[in-house]
């Protein structure tokens, strides 16, 4: 008889929300590698959902579990969007309190909200009043000169006081001016110890860590101190990493999924999307890194890059590119 698996936190491993990257096509591809990974949408602002001319919440239920990341600071707008997302089948609502870009700040959401903990708490409270699925917060360890551990604890204390039980902490502070979003992911030093300390001081909360995590061994190390790990660019640029996640972090009997297997399992989805008028390039741009460090990877990338954008490009482009790499 198979042994029952231990119960793990839903977000024991997750792929970070990344603007322009974690689209629905990307998430469908990532799901081919892992049954258990929690996948996040790109950040979608509440006003965009409310006023948009097209459907920002569209996704395939086969992508689940998927969390919708919302940007905003109007409690009523966020409440409305959270309810919509739950009705559409999302598994979690996440509030962005970590993005430092100027555009995000001008909209009064993202990392600048760390200085407005009471407002964040009100937003969380309103969203939780409308849904039964978890409402979580993704944030930094500080902003600008507000970077003391006491400041972080005060923020967590106020937000959890209104019911938030799950936080994803990017283990860097954010500079709200002077650095680009890319620089804010690289220049402020990582401080994993501070996130570990947060879990020790708030043991009743669920804490996941994010920032600079690239290997299975690093993930296992972090999971000795926190409840979950979130990986961003490494998962996108080297998606084969995801094929190891289920076995390494959830079920030792789970198979390792190869990039070749994941791409082959994507083919019916690609054909379906093409039949609905989606251009091939919009899908395959997310699978270019599938065979990183594998023989034939360069030919795979080149063939897709040179042919997927062409008018009428079909599934045969992916099948031909796949023939360049070893299974």
UniProtKB/Swiss-Prot annotation:
Pfam families: Dus
Protein name (record): tRNA-dihydrouridine(20/20a) synthase
Residues at which FMN binds: 17-19, 69, 138, 170, 210-212, 232-233
Family note: Belongs to the Dus family. DusA subfamily.
UniProt superkingdom: Bacteria
SUPFAM superfamilies from the UniProt entry: FMN-linked oxidoreductases
Keyword set includes Nuclease: no
Keyword field: Flavoprotein, FMN, NADP, Oxidoreductase, RNA-binding, tRNA processing, tRNA-binding
Cofactor(s) listed: FMN
UniProt organism field: Haemophilus influenzae (strain ATCC 51907 / DSM 11121 / KW20 / Rd)
This protein's record includes keyword Flavoprotein: yes
The protein's Enzyme Commission number: 1.3.1.-, 1.3.1.91
């Amino acid at each position: 008889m198979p042994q029952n698996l231990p119960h793990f936190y839903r977000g024991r491993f997750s792929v970070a929300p990344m603007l322009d990257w974690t689209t629905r096509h990307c998430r469908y591809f990532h799901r081919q590698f892992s049954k258990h990974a929690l996948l996040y949408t790109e950040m979608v602002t509440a006003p965009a959902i409310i006023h948009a001319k097209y459907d920002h919440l569209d996704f395939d239920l086969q992508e689940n579990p998927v969390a919708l990341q919302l940007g905003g600071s109007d409690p009523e707008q966020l409440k409305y969007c959270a309810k919509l997302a739950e009705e559409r089948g999302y598994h979690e609502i996440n509030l962005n309190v970590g993005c430092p870009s100027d555009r995000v700040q001008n909209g009064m959401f993202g990392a600048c909200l760390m200085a407005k903990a009471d407002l964040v708490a009100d937003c969380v409270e309103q969203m939780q009043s409308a849904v039964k699925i978890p409402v979580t917060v993704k944030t930094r360890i500080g902003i600008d000169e507000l970077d003391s551990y006491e400041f972080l604890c005060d923020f967590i204390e106020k937000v959890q006081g209104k019911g938030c039980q799950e936080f994803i902490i990017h283990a860097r502070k954010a500079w709200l001016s002077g650095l680009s979003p890319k620089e804010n992911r690289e220049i402020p030093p990582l401080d994993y110890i501070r996130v570990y300390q947060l879990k020790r001081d708030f043991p009743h909360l669920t804490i996941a860590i994010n920032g600079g995590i690239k290997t299975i061994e690093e993930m296992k190390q972090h999971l000795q101190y926190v409840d979950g790990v979130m990986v961003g660019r490494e998962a996108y640029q080297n998606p084969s990493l995801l094929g190891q996640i289920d076995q390494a972090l959830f079920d030792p009997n789970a198979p390792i999924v190869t990039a070749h297997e994941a791409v082959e399992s994507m083919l019916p989805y690609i054909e379906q999307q093409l039949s609905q008028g989606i251009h091939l390039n919009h899908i395959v741009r997310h699978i270019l890194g599938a065979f990183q460090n594998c023989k034939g990877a360069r030919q795979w990338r080149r063939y897709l890059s040179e042919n997927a954008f062409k008018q009428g490009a079909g599934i045969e482009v992916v099948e031909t590119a796949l023939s360049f790499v070893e299974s």
